[in-house]
């Protein structure tokens, strides 16, 4: 019996260490892997991501089914985030300001929460988030990967033009005028 307990404990320690190693590798290598797949401005090879955006089925905070294709006639900024993610929380005011500035010029910002619905609802009410929030929970990780986020890190943002073509992606929080440098030229065209 003691031998079985020792073996179970050893297996648990090995699995725990492997999980920590995998998470650390994803955190450290994620930006490198993302950069090698074209982080930032995008060129060829974005059709798969565009199709994934059009096909994405999510729900809003009231439980109503929503599709990202509802906004594909606009410049669409999809921001993947979670309530527990500090950089996600820090960039929310920038996203709200960008929506207020660029909405009249055909830009929509949609937050896609990789989190529990009740926590997201409470958070959005307390922060007075002014853009649409959709729930993806764990399914959002697969959508993020289809859109180029191989590490699964948050926050992660993709931008699609009015034709639904992915034109930009970013792993990590926006700072200062980052959004203006992306949305300004797109909103002029």
Predicted stretch roles:
Residues 89-128, 138-145:
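Structural microenvironment flanking redox-active thiols in thiol-disulfide oxidoreductases
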Residues 56, 80-81, 123, 131:
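Conserved hydrophobic/aromatic "anchor" residues
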Residues 134-136:
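Short acidic-hydrophobic, aromatic-tinged amphipathic segments that line or gate anion-handling sites
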Residues 68-85:
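Short active-site neighborhood of thiol/selenol oxidoreductases, capturing the structured segment around
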Residues 126-129, 138-184:
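Thiol/disulfide oxidoreductase modules built on the thioredoxin-like
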Residues 53-54, 76, 154-155:
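Short loop/turn microsegments at loop-to-beta-strand junctions
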Residues 61, 71, 162:
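Short, ordered coil/turn segments that flank beta-strands lining enzyme active or ligand-binding pockets
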Residues 1-55:
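N-terminal targeting signals for export/organelle localization
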């Amino acid at each position: 019996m003691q031998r079985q307990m020792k073996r179970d404990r050893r297996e648990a320690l090995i699995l725990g260490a492997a999980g920590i190693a995998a998470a650390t590798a994803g955190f450290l290598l994620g930006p490198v892997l993302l950069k090698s797949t074209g982080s930032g401005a995008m060129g060829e090879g974005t059709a798969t991501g565009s199709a994934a955006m059009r096909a994405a089925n999510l729900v809003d905070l009231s439980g109503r089914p929503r599709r990202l294709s509802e906004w594909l006639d606009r410049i669409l900024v999809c921001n993947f985030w979670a309530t527990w993610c500090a950089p996600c929380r820090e960039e929310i005011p920038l996203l709200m300001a960008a929506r207020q500035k660029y909405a009249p010029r055909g830009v929509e910002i949609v937050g896609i929460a990789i989190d529990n619905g009740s926590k997201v609802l409470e958070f959005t009410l307390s922060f007075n988030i002014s853009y649409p929030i959709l729930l993806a929970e764990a399914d959002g990780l697969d959508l993020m990967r289809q859109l180029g986020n191989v590490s699964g890190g948050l926050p992660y943002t993709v931008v699609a033009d009015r034709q639904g073509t992915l034109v930009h992606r970013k792993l990590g929080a926006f700072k200062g005028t980052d959004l203006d440098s992306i949305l300004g030229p797109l909103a002029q065209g």
